Regions:
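Polybasic "coupling" helices that flank or enter modular domains
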Residues: 120-191
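Phosphate-/nucleic-acid-contacting segments
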Residues: 152, 165-238
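Cyclic-nucleotide recognition modules
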Residues: 76-134, 138
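A generic structural signal for short hydrophobic patches within well-formed alpha-helices
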Residues: 25, 115-116, 225
Length: 238
């Protein structure tokens, strides 16, 4: 069982709640209980009408959609300190995705009424939520554009650049992606197949852009990675 102080501390790390005082966070923690969820749990599907905003305290959650041919396309990876389900609270009901726990997670959820009350009292929360929604929609559009216009190696390079921005860690040997992603997971994030991603990852390594060490992606030439994301792989490497 999580101690009250820990609940408040984790709430204070939520990007959407950054304008709340410690006293306000403490009060909120008493009204939105924590839920511990096992890996693989589906929080919602496109068919469900859930009017809750989920705040992720620990773990990671994958937002994805399913193509007509049955392939899964990952739209976003939600990390601790971020929210998901925000699209369900829009008047247009924009959400058309699944949300799945990638590992054991801890979440708390606010109902539409609770959120509306909070936004009335703290308009800064509403402004931040609009910013988050805008950024996420921009990310979705970027993913769709990549799938429609770029070959798989360029898509993979673009994805790695986004992962650098969201979770990259600087080490003495350069930047690395701390989380491990299987080739199947990477494929779902760029609308491809596992075998194709395996070949594309090999091409990026042949170019000297990345290395795989202990199943983690290490960036060895950022400039090369950026060029590949824009121009694709030179014909001599294909």
């Amino acid at each position: 069982m999580m101690m009250p102080e820990e609940k408040v501390r984790l709430l204070s790390m939520m990007e959407v709640l950054e304008s709340l005082s410690q006293e306000e966070l403490k009060e909120l923690s008493q009204r939105v209980p924590d839920t511990h969820v096992e890996k693989g749990r589906i929080f919602y599907t496109p068919e469900e009408k859930s009017e809750r905003l989920f705040m992720l305290k620990k773990g990671r959650v994958r937002l994805y959609t399913v193509a007509p041919d049955g392939r899964e396309l990952t739209l976003a990876i939600v990390d601790a300190g971020q929210v998901f389900g925000e699209m369900a609270l829009t008047a247009q009901q924009l959400r058309g995705a699944y949300a799945e726990a990638m590992e054991p997670v801890v979440v708390c959820a606010m109902s539409r009424n609770q959120l509306e009350e909070l936004v009335r009292d703290k308009p800064e929360v509403g402004i931040k939520l609009i910013s988050i929604l805008s950024e996420r929609l921009s990310l979705y559009e970027s993913r769709m554009e990549d799938i429609g216009l770029k070959e798989v190696p360029a898509r993979l390079a673009s994805l790695i650049l986004r992962l650098i921005d969201s979770e990259g860690v600087m080490t003495r040997a350069g930047v690395k992606i701390p989380n491990r992603y299987t080739h199947e997971q990477l494929a779902a994030m760029i609308g491809s197949k596992r075998e194709t991603v395996t070949r594309a990852l090999g091409q990026l390594q042949d170019l000297g852009a990345v290395e795989i060490r202990r199943r983690k992606i290490h960036i060895t030439d950022l400039g090369c990675l950026e060029r590949t994301a824009t121009l694709g792989v030179p014909s001599k490497v294909v």
